[in-house]
Design a protein with these regions (language model features):
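C-terminal helical "tail/cap" subdomain of flavin- and related membrane-associated enzymes
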Residues: 18, 23-32, 211, 258, ...
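Short, flexible helix/strand-to-coil boundary loops that buttress conserved ligand/catalytic motifs
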Residues: 3, 38, 76, 85, ...
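Conserved mid-domain beta->alpha element of the FAD-binding
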Residues: 106, 131, 220-320
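Active-site-adjacent segment of FAD-dependent monooxygenases/related oxidoreductases
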Residues: 1-66, 75, 322-325, 332
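Alpha-helical elements of Rossmann-like donor-binding domains used by nucleotide-donor carbohydrate transfer enzymes
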Residues: 9, 58, 62, 113, ...
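Short glycine/proline- and charge-enriched loop/turn segments
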Residues: 38-46, 176-182, 284, 318-321
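Conserved FAD-binding catalytic core of PHBH/FMO-like flavoproteins
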Residues: 50, 54, 60-219
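Acidic/histidine metal-binding catalytic segments
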Residues: 2-6, 10, 203-223, 284-300
Length: 364
């Protein structure tokens, strides 16, 4: 599930957004009282920023349906990458197969093998974990189309209507050293324990919100530790090199606090498609392999320049927003609930308002 803005640019438009959401309502988990209600209309945008949930399965199916049959090869884990001369990359799969390619885009998530190949270190654990869940209401859930966020008591959680019948929720928490030793392992392995743990962390929350968590089926929850890439690595690292580049979580694993990880991956797919289409244009078909390779490398370098600062910005903002929204203690509670509430939501929404252009290449 991701929060995103629906773009109406480009030749084809797919409307995958669920219910358009009108505002973000923040509530203190300490007091149970609302601290801000920010409408999306108040966020400066280019006029086509619609916020809503996109169901991951629907997005993947829509993208896959656009490709010729047989383009996607499933269950093909990349285990090693080697340069073959200056032009080709040899990709070794777990089942022993070798593939040869001129371009390799590593979008293999937070444990990216391609990021290893480009010299990035493994993303760091941020000391927080996240649980996600989904609840279906046969007769409708009755919630307004708003994002409901709760902060304080060392947790940060939210409930988001996807449509009239589905609610998505998340909760992030910092395992205490004790929980780390005993309960944390148990939590990931035992959904009953996980649910009890979540219910114990909600704080002062109106009953109708608590009921969402109580109603969640055990198999509809997933829990995972949160990891991110240090921003300085993104400043200095090789986002692209010798026809290989990174996109999505492989490039910028970030905490989920501004809901932009998957949105940024989509931005990258648009920019990459545009740049590579330009580099591989058919009217260059008589060029030598070396010339073509140089064009590919130039296009990936241009892509890397476009994404470097955006990635640094998103990873850093997400981290800072998470620290402020999840921390506790009297001073932090006061600052977050009385002074920063609107600012933090505004920062989140501003990051979503990004124009990555259209798929059509500019005439150059
Ligand atoms: C609690 C939580 C809430 C979130 N909320 C939002 C939100 O509201 N909005 C938003 O935009 N983002 C959100 N995100 C982030 C979002 O889920 C990720 O940024 C997004 O899924 C990244 O997509 P990706 O394709 O880069 O990586 P993934 O989704 O991780 O996909 C990677 C793919 O690569 C494959 N793969 C892995 N290793 C290999 C290998 N060696 N060889 C071949 N294939 C491989 C995997 O099987 C997988 O299919 C949230 C994340 C969390 C944890």
């Amino acid at each position: 599930m991701l929060l995103g803005s629906a773009s109406t640019s480009g030749r084809r438009t797919f409307n995958l957004l669920g219910h358009p959401l009108a505002s973000v309502v923040s509530t203190s988990a300490n007091s149970g009282l609302p601290t801000s209600d920010t409408t999306f209309a108040a966020v400066p945008s280019r006029g086509d920023l619609n916020v809503g949930c996109v169901v991951r399965k629907a997005l993947l199916e829509t993208l896959a349906n656009e490709l010729p049959q047989g383009t996607i090869r499933y269950s093909s884990k990349v285990v090693r990458i080697q340069n073959q001369g200056c032009t080709f990359k040899s990709i070794h799969l777990e089942d022993g197969t070798y593939l040869t390619t001129k371009v390799l885009i590593g979008c293999d998530g937070v444990n990216s093998v391609v990021a290893d190949h480009l010299g990035f270190s493994r993303p760091s654990f941020v000391g927080r974990s996240a649980v996600r869940g989904f609840v279906h209401y046969e007769d409708g859930h009755g919630f307004d189309p708003k994002l409901f966020f709760f902060f304080g008591r060392g947790v940060r959680y939210g409930i988001i209507p996807c449509n009239d019948h589905g609610l998505y929720w998340f909760l992030t928490f910092s395992p205490s050293p004790q929980e780390n030793n005993a309960a944390e392992k148990g939590i990931e392995e035992d959904p009953i324990k996980l649910k009890q743990f979540i219910l114990s962390k909600l704080g002062k929350v109106p009953d109708r919100f608590r009921a969402v968590f109580e109603r969640t089926e055990l198999e509809s929850m997933v829990c995972a530790p949160l990891r991110f890439r240090h921003p300085w690595e993104l400043l200095w690292g090789n986002i692209s090199k010798d026809g290989v580049c990174l996109a999505g979580d492989a490039l910028h694993p970030m905490t989920p606090d501004i809901g932009q990880g998957a949105c940024a991956a989509l931005e990258e797919s648009v920019i990459l498609a545009r740049e590579l289409a330009q580099a591989l244009k058919t009217n260059h078909s008589s060029d030598s392999l070396e010339k073509e390779q140089r064009r590919i490398e130039n296009s990936l370098e241009k892509y890397a320049r476009e994404r470097r600062w955006r990635s640094v910005d998103l990873v850093s903002t997400a981290y800072m927003v998470g620290v402020m929204q999840q921390s506790h203690g009297a001073v932090m509670n006061f600052l977050r609930d009385k002074i920063m509430a609107k600012f933090l939501v505004g920062a989140q929404m501003k990051k979503a308002d990004f124009d990555c252009g259209t798929l059509t290449a500019s005439a150059s």
